[in-house]
Amino acid sequence: MYSLKHLLNFVFSFIIILLSSQSFSETISFKGLVLSDFWIKKVIANNNTTSGHIRIENKNEKNERLISVESDFSKITELHDMKIKNDIMIMKHIEEGVLIKSKSQLNLMPGSSHIMFIDLTKSLKKIKNQKVKFNFEKAGSIVINMPIINKTEKSNKKKKHRHH
């Protein structure tokens, strides 16, 4: 038989595990939207730009639009579309925002549309997280503390790269 002390230790440990998994789950539910897999790419060398990535699922009955993204660590924060033309990667600001259809998912990931942080106002090299504000047409705004991660992009590193 287990004593009350053993039972309380088990319950306490179980609660701690649940709370820990919540904080590292990288999933946030917000007004019918599920935000997951969010991260900021670690800055390489003396680069003054970086990218942000997120998966947004719209569980609502109506379409939603991600209008804009804001940060306090870059002078410009934009939603970008990326296309390859004649072996050259071309990125363009998506001024009208991005539509997230009802019951569908938006993936802002490496090698596709993404968030661009341009002209960084502080070094992110020794920082583990940064707050980023997402502005939606219907749901309003939410601030997410996004981890800064050294992930390798899947894109071909030999491709040329230019903005606009």
Region spans (language model):
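Compact, glycine-rich, soluble single-domain proteins
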Residues: 26-164
